[in-house]
Amino acid sequence: MKQYTTPEQTAKLIELGFERPKNTVYTQVAKRNIGYGIVEWEDAGEEGSYSIGELIEMLPDYINGNFVNWEIHTTRGDVKWSVGWDCFETGQFQWIRRTELVNALYEMILKLKEEGVI
């Protein structure tokens, strides 16, 4: 089972205003050795990804003063994970089903962010 978001998913969440993942590290790579053991460094940028736990922490406990019901289910067949939440507009549960839990949570966060819930 995948435990972390992809670099593309991570970049999208950061772009949407979420804090950088806790396991983000700033790295530098050696560009060239300029002699006498001195190395010139070049910034390689930031790496990191969100864990399943960090994605769950992004989800709100309350929407408009109402406690939010979140559900995570395992399913049979090719689609292994199903995440759902109360939709106060329709009064029904909405579901996202994916083979990886991290992908289902990521898509749920995008949907809620798009709707202005988080």
Where are these regions (language model features)?
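N-terminal segment of the canonical double-stranded RNA-binding domain
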Residues: E19, V29-T99
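Extreme N-terminal leader/activation tails
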Residues: M1-N33
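Ampiphathic alpha-helical segments that act as solvent-exposed interaction surfaces
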Residues: Q94-I118
